[in-house]
Amino acid sequence: MHRWTVFNEEINGNLVRVRPVGSVCHGIEFDEMACASVKSSTHNSLWRISEPGALQATNWESEHGFGSCVIDSSKDTPCRQGRIPYYAVMAQTPQHIQTAIQFARHHNLRVAIRNTGHDAIGRSSGRGSLQINVSGLKGIHFLDDFIPQGGYESQGQAVTVGAGVLGIELLTASRIQGVNVVTGTCSSVAATGGYLQGGGTSMLGPAYGMASDNALEFHVITAMGDTIVVNQYQNTDLFWSLRGGGGGTFGVVVNTTIRTFPDVPAVHFLLSSTIHRDTETSLDAEQSLWEITAEIAKLLPDLKRFNNATSSIIVPIRMEDRVTVTAEILLVNTSDIHSAGTYFTRLIKTLDSQGFPYTSNLTLYPQLSTYLSQQRVLDRAGYGIIEGSVLVSEDLFFHPDGISDIMLVLSSLQLEVGDSVEIFMCAGGQVKANKGRVTTALLPTWREAVLLLTIRRTLPPSSMIQRMRNSQLPRLRSLESPYLGSYLNVADPDEPDFRKAFWGDHYSRLYQIKHDRDPNGLFIVRIGVGSEDWDMDGICQFSKMQ
């Protein structure tokens, strides 16, 4: 313990002993008031960010064969550590991270880099690891004329963002500044971090490109414990790999400078439909779910032709007593609400003619930032979730039968209670235009894609998990040939060939950079670059890539 005590002193008392958040509800650690507080907070995403012993998806807190600590299980059920690290460095400065890396290297400890805990394939935790928690690095600094270190050419307006800054925090600050930035759709996902390093999908993707396309500079602490600047002029191998190569793999990113864009007008359409099973109606709930979804999806190619910067997200969900469909469509850099409205009027007439219930709203935002800075999706944390995703090409999307073919596959998936599908039009437009203009580690087929299809399941009995992996995801992957690949931030943790699915032809270069920059494997994450050389826990190295 003396070594840990000295280490804690070296990082100004920011080392904490970590137990799963459910520990206060079990055994000798039981505390009635604390347990009640945990239970009332468990689905709050911001609370989970603040707790180093919690993740957003609870299945990654547990470890098969090494136990779990489920909040709602019996008081007498033992609380096991699972995949939650025993210690966490709650970093407040880059120096704390440097010291932590040096300590981990000296004592041969596995490191888990943890920010908001949103990772859905288990990269933010690890059995027996030392957690480096960067959620406290909160700086935001806007720049009118950014020149990367070592360079001479201005990149225009930008903002330098600390690793722990949430998307909603950056968007709120950007609105005050009169600019926009590319961030994720969930308010509590970090604005940079693993989100950006994994590529970074966004409702602004078609207008401005992927989040990773807009990264201009990183400050990184390497596996050797060195603090370096990474941009197009220096450490160019890492500048390439950090933009799409995946989070938690190449170093600890302390801050990232990203491009900002002038505030512009936008038109936003929102539609929501709910059909209950227990009401007297002639509508079949499941059939109606897909018919409504299909009618919305049919609009997308025409909207894309009307405004190439259009994005959308359609989410059909099956619940125990009802089905719901929610759709958001965003047309960026236009104030022509009347022309846009003609498309939505067509949709409304179709839904009315078929007797579907819905609510809808069409809004002109003089400033896009007003829409972006609205807080969303903060109360869906604290569940076990698995998911998988598939890219859909522009060729299939614009084919006369393309949307029908997509909907035929989606409607055949036989959703279970709690399942959802996400049809995300987040590519095309500037994502496509950046092909050849922006050189990054991003999966190359993103430049050919328009849609990202995701199936998401709250954890049910194991047989249902296997059906998703053995039947539903293969159906999505067979939608077109060749298979374009998957988005590594919204991925099946058992993706059959993750190297090809996440990075395609870029993988061999990524693997070499990983080997050069982290030869001892300090930063190993599940199905990340170089992980094939290690066991699933990233503890035992057993092979080398041939």
UniProtKB/Swiss-Prot annotation:
Residues 81-263 form the FAD-binding PCMH-type domain. InterPro entries: BBE, FAD-bd_PCMH, FAD-bd_PCMH-like_sf, FAD-bd_PCMH_sub2, FAD-linked_Oxidoreductases_BP, Oxid_FAD_bind_N. Keywords: Oxidoreductase. Its EC number is 1.-.-.-. It is an enzyme of class 1 (oxidoreductase). Pfam families: BBE (PF08031), FAD_binding_4 (PF01565). GO terms for molecular function: FAD binding; oxidoreductase activity. The keyword DNA-binding does not apply. Disruption phenotype: Does not seem to affect the production of usterphenyllins and uscandidusins. The keyword Aminoacyl-tRNA synthetase does not apply. Belongs to the oxygen-dependent FAD-linked oxidoreductase family. Nonribosomal peptide synthetase that mediates the biosynthesis of usterphenyllins and uscandidusins, p-terphenyl derivatives. The function of ucdF within the pathway still remains to be determined. The pathway begin with the biosynthesis of 4-hydroxyphenylpyruvate (HPPA) from L-tyrosine, possibly by the aminotransferase ucdG. The nonribosomal peptide synthetase ucdA then condenses two HPPA units to produce atromentin. This is Flavin-dependent oxygenase ucdF. It comes from Aspergillus ustus. The lineage of its organism: Eukaryota, Fungi, Dikarya, Ascomycota, Pezizomycotina. The gene is ucdF.
